[in-house]
C-alpha cells in the first residue's frame, strides 16, 4: 500500500511539474519557450458616444501591451484581452483559462457613436 502511495505521489508531482497550468514553463501560448514571461499593461482608451462612462469617459480598457516576448506575447495578450481586469499584471498566459471574448471585444462600426450601450471606434 505504501508503494502505491509513493508511486501515485510521484506521478502527481511529475504531472504538476510538466503542466503549464500549474507553473511548469514548457510551452503554452506565449508563456513558455525559454522562460519568457508575459506582462500585461492595460491602457485606458477614451470612450466616445453614449456608453457606460458617459461622454468621453474612460470605461474601455481594451489595449494590452506585453513584454518581453515579442510577437508570441502580443498574441497572448490579444487573445486574453477580454478576461483581464484593470491593473498591471505579470503572469503566464494560459489561453484555456483566460480567453473570453464574448462581450468586451472592441466595438466596430456605426461611425463611432455607439449603439447598444457601448461606444464604437
From Swiss-Prot:
Annotated GO CC locations: egg chorion; extracellular region
Signal peptide: 1-18
Keywords: Secreted, Signal
Matching InterPro entries: Chorion_2
Pfam entry (one): Chorion_2
Protein origin, superkingdom: Eukaryota
Localization terms from the record: Secreted
Main localization (coarse): secreted
Similarity comment: Belongs to the chorion protein S15/S18 family.
Function: Chorion membrane (egg shell) protein; plays a role in protecting the egg from the environment.
Protein name (database record): Chorion protein S15
Highest classification ranks of the organism: Eukaryota, Metazoa, Ecdysozoa, Arthropoda, Hexapoda
Amino acid at each position: 500500500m505504501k508503494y502505491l502511495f509513493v508511486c501515485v505521489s510521484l506521478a502527481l508531482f511529475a504531472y504538476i511539474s510538466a503542466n503549464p497550468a500549474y507553473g511548469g514553463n514548457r510551452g503554452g501560448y506565449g508563456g513558455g519557450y525559454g522562460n519568457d514571461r508575459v506582462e500585461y499593461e492595460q491602457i485606458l482608451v477614451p470612450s466616445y458616444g453614449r456608453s457606460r462612462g458617459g461622454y468621453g469617459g474612460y470605461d474601455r480598457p481594451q489595449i494590452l501591451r506585453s513584454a518581453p516576448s515579442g510577437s508570441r506575447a502580443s498574441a497572448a495578450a490579444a487573445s486574453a484581452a477580454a478576461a483581464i481586469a484593470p491593473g498591471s499584471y505579470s503572469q503566464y498566459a494560459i489561453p484555456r483559462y483566460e480567453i473570453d471574448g464574448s462581450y468586451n471585444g472592441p466595438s466596430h462600426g456605426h461611425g463611432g457613436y455607439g449603439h447598444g450601450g457601448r461606444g464604437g471606434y
